[in-house]
Amino acid sequence: MSFINYSSREINCKIVYYGPGLCGKTTNLQYIYNKTAAETKGKLISLSTETDRTLFFDFLPLSLGEIRGFKTRFHLYTVPGQVFYDASRKLILKGVDGVVFVADSQIERMEANMESLENLRINLAEQGYDLNKIPYVIQYNKRDLPNAVTVEEMRKALNHRNIPEYQAVAPTGVGVFDTLKAVAKLVLTELKKGG
């Protein structure tokens, strides 16, 4: 969970973007990074493998205020979407404060979405987390594609608990910051509860 840096008076929170391969996790993070003021963000780190990559960076949003005199710094991570990188996904989930599940809206990716969501549940449970109890939002990405299923179908397949959900077209930024703000607010609410 979050850790406190007393010398800089910052609470550090980890948000992980999770989802199947090529659903837009990396595109989300790159868009956020490119639109975040240079003085509020760290370096964008990319760990590449032959077929996938993990991105992460941290930033200090100025608009979210303070909690008990501490600023909140968010560390954003993507997980590799390919199934054979499951050990990496588990490692990246360690210490998570909030999750964005990025779903690919294309009809042919619905099964991959459902498998990835179940994989998220399992990997969180193995580390003592419950997806029902941590800050969590869903992003339905690639809404602009002609083969995108309806939001109702996405909801029926992926959002049984009626958690916050957002439509997105990550390359153009549609829905990207709405999704991030939603999960950040949920994380801050948990922090204020002392959770």
Curated annotation (Swiss-Prot):
A molecular-function term among this protein's GO annotations = GTPase activity
Q: Name one GO cellular component term.
A: cytoplasm
Q: Where in the cell is it found?
A: Cytoplasm
Classification via InterPro entries: Gliding_Motility_GTPase (IPR052705), P-loop_NTPase (IPR027417), Small_GTPase_ARF/SAR (IPR006689)
Which amino acids does the record list as binding GTP? 19-26, 78-82, 141-144
Residues passing through the membrane, by range: none
Main localisation, per the record?
Answer: cytoplasm
Does the keyword Coiled coil feature in the UniProt annotation? yes
Q: Which residues form a coiled coil?
A: 99-128
SUPFAM superfamilies, per the entry? P-loop containing nucleoside triphosphate hydrolases
What the protein does comes down to: Required for multicellular development and for both mechanisms of gliding: social (S) and adventurous (A) motility. Acts as an intracellular switch to coordinate A and S motilities. Controls the direction of gliding and gliding speed.
Stated family: Belongs to the small GTPase superfamily. Arf family. MglA subfamily.
Instruction: Give the quaternary structure.
Output: Interacts with MasK and AglZ.
Please identify the protein, giving its name as recorded. Mutual gliding-motility protein MglA
> What is the gene called?
mglA
